[in-house]
């Protein structure tokens, strides 16, 4: 009878296991196909043994902590298998503490792109001076902060640091002296819809000269005057505006972009903030919650 039970269950189990993502193969082959009363059956294993099994199936992930993994699987060792184990694994990983409680966001862009107005939209109040002017309005670094989704957002508005007239090395040192530790977790490169000009291209180039090519892994393209797109989507605008340079920049930033109507209120304002936070969470996840750092010439490695 035991032979028949084992044979039938083994055939069914093997078929199911073949459809699972790789981290679960060894776990289920070793434990869930065991007969009742045999060693290795998880329903008869102790909590300690369950913890050991969890480490073996997830130890390949560099962002998982052994203690956290063990704790999460001990809560319900007899829980039913999810319909999509891979999805639950991703959820468990993302629930790890990769998001700092305090996030520093750096606003950059050419003069007139709407940096200050975007900063005010993120903060939910008027903090930075914002007006239409042919000359730069923001003449110095300014900071504002707010609580959002249980996190403290520190938004830093910048003067015209991406001007081609500036010396990249001198600008980088000045930024390091002014910005507080731990440094920016995301850089918001502000671009006005419908006006991706040569100056915008120069601003993107200067951004990389100042911070290094690695900065694009922390950069989100923020398009202001989103309302001018009317019924069209931002994705369509980027891909169909016949501007290969803009599309290439978006690709370099891994398609992280969002649109802002800086006159929006209520639900529209909340929706665009939510989209921005999703892009920020994406950066934090990909970089394991670390802020951006760079090497300065003739200076030891310094955190921006």
UniProtKB/Swiss-Prot annotation:
Residues 39-86 are annotated as: Disordered. Residues 224-227 are annotated as: G4. GO terms for cellular component: cytosol. One of its GO terms (molecular function) is GTP binding. Expressed in B and T-cells and peritoneal macrophages. InterPro entries: G_AIG1, GIMA/IAN/Toc, P-loop_NTPase. Residues 100-301 form the AIG1-type G domain. Keywords: Cytoplasm, GTP-binding, Nucleotide-binding. This is GTPase IMAP family member 6. The gene is Gimap6.
């Amino acid at each position: 009878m035991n032979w028949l039970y084992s044979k039938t269950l083994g055939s069914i189990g093997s078929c199911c296991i073949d459809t699972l993502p790789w981290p679960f193969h060894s776990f289920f082959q070793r434990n869930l196909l065991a007969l009742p009363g045999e060693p290795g059956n998880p329903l008869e294993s102790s909590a300690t043994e369950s913890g050991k099994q969890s480490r073996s199936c997830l130890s390949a992930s560099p962002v998982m902590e052994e203690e956290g993994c063990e704790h999460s699987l001990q809560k319900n060792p007899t829980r039913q298998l999810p319909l999509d184990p891979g999805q639950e694994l991703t959820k468990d990983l993302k629930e790890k503490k990769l998001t700092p409680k305090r996030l520093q966001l750096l606003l950059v862009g050419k003069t007139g792109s709407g940096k200050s107005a975007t900063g005010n939209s993120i903060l939910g109040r008027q903090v930075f001076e914002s007006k239409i002017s042919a000359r730069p309005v923001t003449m110095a670094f300014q900071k504002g902060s707010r609580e959002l989704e249980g996190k403290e957002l520190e938004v830093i508005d910048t003067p015209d640091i991406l001007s081609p007239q500036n010396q990249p090395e001198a600008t980088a040192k000045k930024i390091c002296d002014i910005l507080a530790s731990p440094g920016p977790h995301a850089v918001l490169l502000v671009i006005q819809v419908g006006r991706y000009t040569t100056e915008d291209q120069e601003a993107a180039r200067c951004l990389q000269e100042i911070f290094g090519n690695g900065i694009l892994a922390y950069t989100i393209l923020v398009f202001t005057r989103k309302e001018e797109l009317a019924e069209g989507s931002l994705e369509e605008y980027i891909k169909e505006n016949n501007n290969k340079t803009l599309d290439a920049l978006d690709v370099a930033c891994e398609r992280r972009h969002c649109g802002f109507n800086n006159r929006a209120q209520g639900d529209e304002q909340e929706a665009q903030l939510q989209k921005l936070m999703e892009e920020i969470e994406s950066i934090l996840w990909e970089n394991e919650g670390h802020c951006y750092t760079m090497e300065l010439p003739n200076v030891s490695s310094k955190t921006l």
